[in-house]
Amino acid sequence: MVEYASKEPSAFAEMLGGLIGANVTSRPEKKQDFDTLVARVGIWVTDIDEGVTLAFDAGKLTVHNGLEPNRTLTIRAEAETVMSLSNLRIGLFGMPVYYDEVGRGVAAKLLQGRLKIDGMLSNIATLNRVTRIFSVQ
């Protein structure tokens, strides 16, 4: 289900791969999203100058060290902000909740430019699906 492109994945790559693997294994609704998602999602953590590319391929995830080309979405933020994305609650119709404390914090960082998501507007459905898979809530 989750594999690593490098024989020596970074700690960040292992952490994200492990988080997603655990979420998908323990929650049927996340598995359904995972099994249908085909996208390449880059995550660049600005304060540690490190990133990964999550290559989702309909039930399989390959985690790459660094940003690989041809990404559908690229998320750029500090480590704390990236981790807060995993705490977003998922509400009605599978949409992320932005009206609680965590959601307001994420929305504020997006508006302030402290969270940047390249490709967001043209791939909002993909972003929502990735958020559902990534969220531990």
Where are these regions (language model features)?
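Feature captures hydrophobic
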Residues: 1-137
